[in-house]
UniProtKB/Swiss-Prot annotation:
This is 4-hydroxy-3-methylbut-2-enyl diphosphate reductase. Its EC number is 1.17.7.4. Binds 1 [4Fe-4S] cluster per subunit. GO terms for molecular function: 4 iron, 4 sulfur cluster binding; 4-hydroxy-3-methylbut-2-enyl diphosphate reductase activity; metal ion binding. It catalyses: isopentenyl diphosphate + 2 oxidized [2Fe-2S]-[ferredoxin] + H2O = (2E)-4-hydroxy-3-methylbut-2-enyl diphosphate + 2 reduced [2Fe-2S]-[ferredoxin] + 2 H(+); dimethylallyl diphosphate + 2 oxidized [2Fe-2S]-[ferredoxin] + H2O = (2E)-4-hydroxy-3-methylbut-2-enyl diphosphate + 2 reduced [2Fe-2S]-[ferredoxin] + 2 H(+). Keywords: 4Fe-4S, Iron, Iron-sulfur, Isoprene biosynthesis, Metal-binding, Oxidoreductase. Isopentenyl diphosphate binds at residues 41, 74, 124, 225-227, 269. Pfam families: LYTB (PF02401). PANTHER family: 4-HYDROXY-3-METHYLBUT-2-ENYL DIPHOSPHATE REDUCTASE. The keyword Metal-binding applies. It comes from Francisella philomiragia subsp. philomiragia (strain ATCC 25017 / CCUG 19701 / FSC 153 / O#319-036).
């Protein structure tokens, strides 16, 4: 059997920055180090950081006063920021810069008393953080997940309206909803196209480009990873068997019976070493009869610098 490796795959710049932030904070600060929410949606990464002394909490209320705390890559609401400030925490913000861009857009809309529509998945931590950027008493922020939701919107002033999107959605996922918004509210304003997360789109494009070449797909990523689930869905929608795995132990030999080409990719929160371990396990269950090839794709060269406070601490300790 042949294994085709999707490109790009795995860690995006925002995830790399978040994980590196936690690891560097562990070096420059005294334990324990608290992280609000899973820093990224990957069980293996989170478990590894727990072993190094990181304490993950759901809310800042669980963090002792004056302690060291990190915000996850998904970002937080203004209410969470204020709660952290009251506790006098040593705070490092690992929010993805692309999420921060979305936050700025929503806050600007709020400051202008414009109502806001957010395209995203209900309950996702990024969505909760973005919704929590809106404070205007003269308007509201609405969450839509489908074109049907757009039809139900009751907007107070359609001439002063803004929309934003969850970063882990792709252009393909949001296109129909955005068109529905523009059809119903012709004066609605939105972000620039380049504000859309490059990583989500690139990883989905990579999968789409190899679908005609494969008859089974394995995606390395956790069940609670939005972008990993989308990668799997791209294959299943085309009638291709697809599986989402946290680690090599999830691999089953029956998946590859009578299969000729297996595609392998990874969500934006999955490290490359996990991908290589999964490949090794696939080769083992296929009794070594495997050839591995890289599938050509977009080359990513995006880098996000560490939080300013952390860079200052690193310089101060050297």
């Amino acid at each position: 059997m042949k294994i085709l490796l999707a490109n790009p795959r795995g860690f995006c710049a925002g995830v790399s920055r978040a994980v590196e932030t936690v690891e560097k904070v562990l070096e420059v600060e005294k334990s324990p180090v608290y992280v609000r929410h899973e820093v990224v949606h990957n069980k293996v990464v989170v478990d590894s950081l727990k072993k190094k002394g990181v304490v993950f909490v759901k809310e800042v209320d669980e963090v002792p006063d004056d302690a060291v705390c990190i915000f996850s890559a998904h970002g937080v609401s203004l209410q969470v920021e204020e709660a952290a400030s009251k506790k006098n925490l040593v705070l490092y913000d690992a929010t993805c810069p692309l999420v921060t861009k979305v936050h700025r857009g929503v806050r600007l809309a709020s400051n202008n008393d414009a109502e806001c529509v957010l395209i995203g998945h209900k309950g996702h931590p990024e969505v909760q953080g973005t919704m929590g950027q809106y404070r205007s008493e003269k308007g509201a922020i609405y969450l839509v997940e489908s074109e049907q939701d757009v039809a139900k919107l009751d907007i107070k002033n359609p001439d002063n309206l803004y929309y934003a999107t969850q970063t882990t959605l792709s252009v393909d996922e949001t296109q129909g909803i955005i068109e529905s918004l523009k059809n119903r509210f012709p004066n609605i304003k939105g972000p620039k196209k380049e504000d859309i997360c490059y990583a989500t789109q690139n990883r989905q494009t990579a999968i789409k480009s190899m679908l005609k070449e494969i008859d089974v797909l394995v995606v390395v990523g956790s069940q609670n990873s939005s972008n990993s689930n989308r990668l799997k869905e791209l294959a299943t929608l085309e009638g291709i068997d697809a599986y989402l795995v946290d680690n090599p132990a999830d691999i089953k030999s029956t998946w590859f019976e009578n299969k000729k080409v297996c595609g392998v990719s990874a969500g934006a929160s999955a490290p490359e070493y996990l991908v290589q371990q999964v490949i090794t396990e696939i080769s083992r269950v296929c009794e070594g009869d495997v050839v591995v090839e890289e599938f050509d794709g977009i080359k990513e060269e995006v880098y996000f610098p560490l939080p300013r406070l952390l860079k200052q601490k690193i310089i101060g300790t050297n």
